[in-house]
Amino acid sequence: MADLEAAEEFTALYADNHRRVYAYAVARAGRPLADEVVAETFLVAWRSFAKMPRTAALPWLLGVARNVIRARNRDEERHRLVAGELRDWAAEPDIADGVAERSAVLTALAGLSENDRETLTLIAWDGLSPRAAARVVNCSTPAFLVRLHRARNRLARAVAAADELTIAKEPSR
């Protein structure tokens, strides 16, 4: 009976969190590896289900997904893939307002360190609170807030530098 209850509880956990874990995996490992990362994440969750924190399941699952991704990819290769994806996204034609700003931000983001990118995207793309994001990267909330502040400053400087470079390249009239 307990096994059936655990299976039902795990099924509910999967249904509640699968999309967010998948989105996290796609954003960090790309679509080709996302299904494998999600499968391994939930396999770890099933094996550790008795010890898993129920009140903070999503941050715990995202932390597991993070570890799965890091085990699969070395930092240099991962950086190359993310930078390539961001350049592709920035190069896509987009008729919406702010195309230049979007391109500048994505290019600047691609130039940041992996830790800065992850810190910024956990908040901006994944919609996590600083507290939940701190759990994902396995640090305290105050330490994460410092990381976030510094990453935002570095991103702002990179965008400003890109804007200055663009202005310098424009022909004078």
Predicted segment positions?
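Short, charged helix-capping/linker segments at alpha-helix termini
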Residues: 1-12, 22-40, 49-56
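C-terminal edge and immediately downstream basic/flexible tail or linker adjoining helix-turn-helix-like DNA-binding
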Residues: 1-5, 9, 136, 152-173
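Σ70-family region 2.3-2.4 aromatic/basic alpha-helix that recognizes the −10 promoter
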Residues: 18, 39-48, 55-78, 148-152
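Arg/Lys-rich amphipathic alpha helix in sigma70-family domain 2
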Residues: 62-84, 97-98, 157, 161-163
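DNA-recognition helix of helix-turn-helix
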Residues: 66, 131, 137-161
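Internal acidic/polar
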Residues: 71, 79-102, 129, 168-172
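Short amphipathic alpha-helical boundary/capping segments
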Residues: 104-113
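A short pre-motif secondary-structure segment
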Residues: 119-120
